[in-house]
Every structure is written in C-alpha cells, then in structure tokens.
Curated annotation (Swiss-Prot):
GO terms for biological process: 'de novo' IMP biosynthetic process. Keywords: Hydrolase, Multifunctional enzyme, Purine biosynthesis, Transferase. Its EC number is 2.1.2.3, 3.5.4.10. Belongs to the PurH family. This is Bifunctional purine biosynthesis protein PurH. The keyword Cell membrane does not apply. One of its GO terms (cellular component) is cytosol. The IMP cyclohydrolase activity resides in the N-terminal region. It comes from Vibrio cholerae serotype O1 (strain ATCC 39541 / Classical Ogawa 395 / O395). It comes from the Bacteria. It catalyses: (6R)-10-formyltetrahydrofolate + 5-amino-1-(5-phospho-beta-D-ribosyl)imidazole-4-carboxamide = 5-formamido-1-(5-phospho-D-ribosyl)imidazole-4-carboxamide + (6S)-5,6,7,8-tetrahydrofolate; IMP + H2O = 5-formamido-1-(5-phospho-D-ribosyl)imidazole-4-carboxamide. Residues 1-148 form the MGS-like domain. SMART domains: AICARFT_IMPCHas, MGS. Pathway: Purine metabolism; IMP biosynthesis via de novo pathway; 5-formamido-1-(5-phospho-D-ribosyl)imidazole-4-carboxamide from 5-amino-1-(5-phospho-D-ribosyl)imidazole-4-carboxamide (10-formyl THF route): step 1/1; Purine metabolism; IMP biosynthesis via de novo pathway; IMP from 5-formamido-1-(5-phospho-D-ribosyl)imidazole-4-carboxamide: step 1/1.
C-alpha cells in the first residue's frame, strides 16, 4: 500500500515570513492551490501568486481585528477530514480537503522579551487559530502535512519532486512531531509568562510582589546527541540544548575533530569554559571532574597554559583545557607534546593549531566563538520528586566592593591575587579553598566536608608540586566558621585571605588573621557550588 499523499491544496498563514514567498512559488509551480490569510495572503498576492483568501473560501469574513479568521468548519473539516472515511460528509457540506498546512505562530516570546511589553501586548500575541490548525493537521498526519519550521520548506519540495508531488507517511509523521513540539513550547512560554504575574508565595515569601518564577515551570530542550552512556557506563544518556542557546557555550560549540563528546566531557567542558570567561587577560583553565585543577593568567596563551599546568600536573592528565583567546599553534603543540587531554576549547582555533592537534585524532577540539556578556537564564537541578530552579551565579565583586577587616592592609600584589583567586574559587566545588600567587593558582582544595581540610589539601598540593606558598593569597567560597582554617593557612605561609564573612565567629577569625599578621578581606558574597 502506497502511503504517500499528493499535495493538491495548501493553507499558508505565517507570522515569520522567512522563505514563505519562495516556498509558495515552488508549491504553485507544482500545481498546488494556495489558501491564505491576512498579511500572508497580501504578501503572496503582491508577488504575483494566485491566492484564495480563507474568508472567500469559507464565505465568512475575518472579524474582531483578525482574532477570528480560520476557526471555521470548512477550514478544520478540510484539515481533519479522514480521506476515504469522511468524504461523504465533506461533500455534503462543501468542504474541500486541505492537504498541507503551513503555519507558524504569533511572536509571543519576542513580544514579552521587550521590557516595555504590557499585559495587553502579551495577550494580543497569543495565537489561537494558528495552534488550532497546527494541532488539527498534526492529529491527521495520516492524510495531511503540517509545516511549522521554515527550515523544512526545501525538504518538503525535494520530497514532492521525488514522489510525484506527494509526501510519505514517514515525512508527515516527522513533521507532526515537530508541530506538537512547536505548540508545546509555545503554550509553555505563555504559561511561564502568566505564571510570573501572580504574587510570590511559600514559607519564605511575603507580600504581593510578582515572582520571576512561574507557578508551573515549562522548559523545552532539543536533543542534540545520543550518548554511549551517561556519567557511568550503566546509565543511558543524551544531550539536550535550548531552542535558542546562547553563543559561546558547549551547547553551540563547533567540534573540529575528535571522538564524540561524552556526558562527562560536556559537563567538564562547561565548567572549564564558564570559569575562563571570568578573565579579561589571556587565561587558561584546566578542569578535572568538574573542578579546576589549574588556572593561570599569562602574557599570552602559552604562558597561561604552562602556568596552569604547573598547578597540578597529575590531575591535569586526561583533563579539559579552556582558553579565552584564539588557540595558536605554539600553545597547541605544547599541550599535545606534554599531556593526554580529553577536550580543548577556545573561542577561536587557528589553522596552525588545527593541523597540530590533528596528530592526536581522538582529542576533541572545540571552537565556541566569542562571548559578549554574561550568560542569562536559570540553573536547574533535579531532586527526587522535584526541580530546584535558581538564577545563575553571575555575582562577582570588584575592588571597590571589598572590605578590609584586618589590621594590616593587603599589598597591591596581594589585592590583585585576591581578586584572581576569588574568581577561581567561584568554580570550585564547596567547600572550596584556592591558594594563588602571581595570577596563578598554586593549590586548590575542593569538595571537602570541612573547610579546614580543603585548606590543608590546597597546601599539600602546592607542596607536592614544589610551589612556594609563602606570600600567597587564600580564597574561600564561604565564611570560616572557626579560626582553624586561618591557622592552617598561616602555617602554610598564606599572608592574605579573601572570604565572604558573615560567620557568628567573624571576630574570632579576624583576630586569628591579626595574630598571624595576615590581611583579611571580606567580599560580602558567597559562592557555594554543589
């Protein structure tokens, strides 16, 4: 049985008119009768195409400023009518079959993204007839093709040419899936927007202020990649990306060479890239198991890489390396000749670097593009039975935000290193301690249940690599609950500490710093990372 369906009549009604004229001309050239509405009909007519307006087809005018156009039995009967089963009813009521529906919806997302958008503006951009036609056509995909994406126009024409102006059931089914995805995302955006207009509520909220978090949280992600396995080999996994992901991310990066990215590769590459974005000077970040194990600045990338590698060469083995400048051939050669690396990512990769890395075919080389500003949106974390949603941690202090609470003032060099290692600490798993000196991390203590042990580990790592701690700065992602962390740092040779402050025992901690002759800086900002 031939499951292809010929396309004799198509209804076109689009808000985004990208490519619609060319598509309509291609349909007309293949003998397809065109029905259309409003602005789409006018545009096609202006281009010399023969178009029947839906109002002429139904005998019922558009009304209420265009709110009612296609909600008519002759339209939906033509779309929903089952060929071979509903033909008699359709003939009785003068309903002609519509074989293809080409619809995209009012620009609700763009409208509400405008900071000057009013509720009235939002309401007028809620499409009613469009989603109804889309769902009708998708439901009846056995007989009707629904096209909601402009990037499918060429595909449809190619298949029609290959199948005597017909589309196969497989194609119609795939287009129907895209249609349901389209309307689901659209309705989710509307629900999210209206859900933020109600008062905040919960045990920690008071008053009637609006909430940035909707009553129900709707998010749609598009599958980019199936994976061999997830975090562990017994876990199945896939990688999904946002419908319109921001540039300069692991989600949008171009893979130049190497094996497919694994689940852990993606997570670690994201951690490395987001950390290196914090720095304006040439920087290198090396990540292992989602924690920075080497971070440094330099006069150029080669110097930054050499210094970052020096932080912890053992952990750098099999790590992820991120840069904030174009990867040059000299730096690429230093990496390939020195260590095993899983992923290298940079905003741009020179041809010389590409040629050098090609000698190691399994190394994943990514080019992410330049970043223009901070990443927006929410961070999501699944818990059993729920979802935690929060703003991304975009907080960062400047020099003017710092409060020196010790008797001794930090030197200019200490202050510079304090700001450097504070940025690094933001990306280290809590409890996080970072030792730094001369724009280079010399010891990183991550993920310990007690802060003092993170401090001890940072000192041990520095000592293991022969890095001099004396005169270094220590950053802590959260306050010190006791003085023991300060005592451990002083014993290691730390002379300046930067931390949020805010402990009930702050004075005890400050007193410890003063006893050791250390400078202590409060940021007033915490950077827990779990």
């Amino acid at each position: 049985m031939n499951n292809a369906r010929p396309i004799h009549r198509a209804l076109l009604s689009v808000s985004d008119k990208t490519g619609i004229v060319e598509f309509a001309k291609a349909l007309a050239e293949r003998g397809v009768e065109l029905l259309s509405t409003g602005g789409t009909a006018r545009l096609l007519a202006e281009q010399g195409l023969t178009v029947t307006e839906v109002s002429d087809y139904t005998g019922f005018p558009e009304m209420m400023d265009g709110r009612v156009k296609t909600l008519h039995p002759k339209v939906h009967g033509g779309i929903l009518g089952r060929r071979g089963q509903d033909d008699a009813v359709m003939n009785t009521h003068g309903i002609q079959p519509i074989d293809m529906v080409v619809v995209n919806l009012y620009p609700f997302a763009q409208t509400v993204a405008n900071p000057n958008c009013t509720l009235a503006d939002a309401v007028e951009n809620i499409d009613i007839g469009g989603p109804t036609m889309v769902r009708s056509a998708a439901k009846n995909h056995k007989d009707v093709a629904i096209v909601v994406n402009a990037h499918d126009y060429d595909r449809v024409i190619r298949e029609m040419d290959a199948n005597h102006n017909s589309l196969t059931l497989a194609t119609r089914f795939d287009l129907a899936i895209a249609a349901f995805e389209h309307t689901a995302a659209y309705d989710g955006m509307i629900a999210n927007y209206f859900g933020t207009l109600v008062p905040s509520y919960g045990d920690n909220k008071e008053g009637d202020e609006e909430s940035k978090f909707p009553r129900t949280f709707n998010a749609q992600f598009i599958k980019k990649q199936d994976m061999r396995y997830g975090e562990n080999s017994h876990q199945a996994a896939a990688f999904y990306v946002e419908a319109n992901p921001q540039e300069a991310s692991v989600a949008t990066a171009r893979q130049i060479q190497g094996k497919a990215l694994s689940y852990n590769n993606i997570a670690d590459t994201d951690a490395a890239l987001e950390c290196v974005k914090e720095f304006s000077e040439p920087a290198c970040v090396i990540v292992k198991h989602a924690n920075p194990c080497g971070v440094a600045l330099g006069d150029d990338l080669l110097q930054a890489y050499n210094r970052a590698y020096q932080t912890d060469p053992t952990s750098a083995f099999g790590g992820i390396i991120a840069f904030n400048r174009e990867l040059d051939g000299e730096t690429a050669r230093a990496i390939i000749e020195r260590q095993f690396v899983e992923v290298i990512i940079a905003p741009k990769v020179s041809q010389a670097a590409i040629d050098i890395v090609a000698a190691k075919q399994n190394v994943r080389l990514l080019e992410c593009g330049e970043w223009q500003g901070q990443t927006t949106g929410f961070d999501l974390k699944r818990v059993n039975g729920g979802l935690l949603v929060q703003d991304r941690d975009q907080g960062m202090v400047a020099q003017d935000d710092l409060q020196v609470v010790s008797t001794r003032q930090p030197s200019d060099a200490e202050l510079k290193d304090a700001l450097f290692c504070w940025k690094v600490a933001k990306y280290v798993k809590s409890n996080a301690i970072v030792y730094a000196k001369g724009d280079m991390a010399i010891g990183i203590g991550a993920g310990q249940m007690s802060r003092v042990y993170s401090a001890k580990i940072a000192g041990i790592k520095a000592a293991d690599e022969g890095l001099e701690v004396a005169g270094s700065v220590m950053a802590s992602d959260a306050f010190f609950p006791f003085r023991d962390g300060i005592d451990a740092a002083a014993e290691a040779g730390i002379t300046c500490v930067i931390q949020p402050g805010g402990s009930m025992r702050d004075q005890e901690v400050i007193d410890a710093a003063n006893e050791h002759g250390m400078a202590m800086i409060f940021t007033g900002m915490r950077h827990f990372r779990h």
